[in-house]
Amino acid sequence: MSDNVQQQVDSVGSVTEKLQKTNISRPRKYIPPFARDKPSAGAAPAVGDDESVSSRGSSRSQTPSEFSSNYGGRREYNRGGHYGGGEGRQNNYRGGREGGYSNGGGYRNNRGFGQWRDGQHVIGARNTLLERQLFGAVADGTKVSTGINFEKYDDIPVEVSGGDIEPVNEFTSPPLNSHLLQNIKLSGYTQPTPVQKNSIPIVTSGRDLMACAQTGSGKTAGFLFPILSLAFDKGPAAVPVDQDAGMGYRPRKAYPTTLILAPTRELVCQIHEESRKFCYRSWVRPCAVYGGADIRAQIRQIDQGCDLLSATPGRLVDLIDRGRISLANIKFLVLDEADRMLDMGFEPQIRHIVEGADMTSVEERQTLMFSATFPRDIQLLARDFLKDYVFLSVGRVGSTSENITQKVVHVEDSEKRSYLLDILHTLPPEGLTLIFVETKRMADTLTDYLLNSNFPATSIHGDRTQRERERALELFRSGRTSIMVATAVASRGLDIPNVTHVINYDLPTDIDDYVHRIGRTGRAGNTGQAVAFFNRNNKGIAKELIELLQEANQECPSFLIAMARESSFGGNGRGGRYSGRGGRGGNAYGARDFRRPTNSSSGYSSGPSYSGYGGFESRTPHHGNTYNSGSAQSWW
């Protein structure tokens, strides 16, 4: 045995001696195959060198620019960027605190982002592919355009109370940042809507705002424009130093400066897409978090930078509890569709976010509330969240736009399918049609019926997965599927261009829901048509529906008037609901600033009497849209 071992040792020694004589040695660095034939001066550096592309385990410390926006965190992340440390640059955001930021280069520029460097806003390079994705090509039908009735917005009555601030009549610098104006122009905006004319100077002057405006009037841009303009001018805020950063493992935490809360996933995604347009080539990085999607993917997204965050309340609370998001740096808080969030039971989550988490105090931030309706309980809630705010009411809250031609027809439940097909056969091929039903089962059943009848249709409701809902919206927006059957999930806030027809297959029990449903058409000054199937099952909203039609100067069919009289016989039906919630009539807080006493039932303290959102003192009612079964073209 010892002889065999000695022979093996001798053989190994001889091989080693031969290798030394032939000058063959193990390479000290790994050289990739594609670089082995190149001169040594041009060889790719080995993995592990300072110049190399880092491996997965060290990528965060090697690419500080990837995580340069609004982050504090563990010490090992501070090697490339000054996160939460004393070496950060001086900035002038709300007092010019030091530290917290180091905006690197390549990553953001490659993705259409700029950077904040040495107190200056450095605009990123243009990205033509990203521009086409964000803003579309010329005459792109998937992008909303200004309608032919856009100029009529100037006739809409506007009430502003709580401040003497002059409105702006066009997009100019000042008050808006010059780079933001370029993105506004790329987006196709030519003139501000009434809500934008007033919200821009109010927010840029530093005031809180409660804004009531008709659906489709540009509320989203109404808060994005002034917020982003201030952000572009003042730069990022310093990240607070995490006192526990060095005590064991702690997850990386995002510190956004703007938080936008919305009730539904679809609305959050829509706000996020609008934010991407106006943040293009700037230092501001927008992110979105919402339920129904992979939270790990959303965490990876905010790990790459999060300055402007759009979120649903439930998912945001989850991420706050996980320690992934801090609200200690919030300068702007936006509550969009606030009444809807309370209707959906989000008040505990909203109060936890605003009052229970580490949110900045009401004195340290600007708070904005935007919605189409603001009932009394919402205005009372505003006292806890807003300070010395300006109340803005554009048009009569709870009404509909005269840009929408409304028609109510009497259809029994058993005849609805046949009646629907009659309508769809008369519609032009261009344009999109949105059909609202009350139940998820009916949405799927009606979609199958339309597909079997050779109509391209899809559906969206709460039982569909987030991926299915996003896919359905994509097909509908692009026009590949021109008909969408939806439940209430699509009735609020969604801005889908080119929706020319809305059909209420099932009428809702709440007149506000009807307002939001038909508001999916006739947006941004464009015209639209809305038809409602009405029968005895809907008599509870007959009276309010008549008021709505009269305010918008629409035709009221005789059967609807008779049904309203029948439902109100011996009582006031459901009309009493509005005396407490704030819709039409009485001292409806939804139409005026509840801080101001008034003797007027309209909610406006002065000025002439206006009719609905049309804003005209007198107007001849619409005629000629009575249905005639002998002529399909007489629908509109």
Swiss-Prot record:
Protein source organism: Schizosaccharomyces pombe (strain 972 / ATCC 24843)
Record flagged with keyword Cell cycle: yes
Entry protein name: ATP-dependent RNA helicase ded1
Domain Helicase C-terminal as annotated: residue spans: 403-564
UniProt-listed GO biological process terms: cell division; cytoplasmic translational initiation; negative regulation of cytoplasmic translational initiation in response to stress; regulatory ncRNA-mediated gene silencing
PANTHER family reported for this sequence: ATP-DEPENDENT RNA HELICASE DBP3 (PTHR47958)
Keywords: ATP-binding, Cell cycle, Cell division, Cytoplasm, Helicase, Hydrolase, Initiation factor, Mitosis, Nucleotide-binding, Phosphoprotein, Protein biosynthesis, RNA-binding
Lineage start: Eukaryota, Fungi, Dikarya, Ascomycota, Taphrinomycotina
Domain remarks in the Swiss-Prot or TrEMBL record: The Q motif is unique to and characteristic of the DEAD box family of RNA helicases and controls ATP binding and hydrolysis.
Cross-referenced SUPFAM superfamilies: P-loop containing nucleoside triphosphate hydrolases
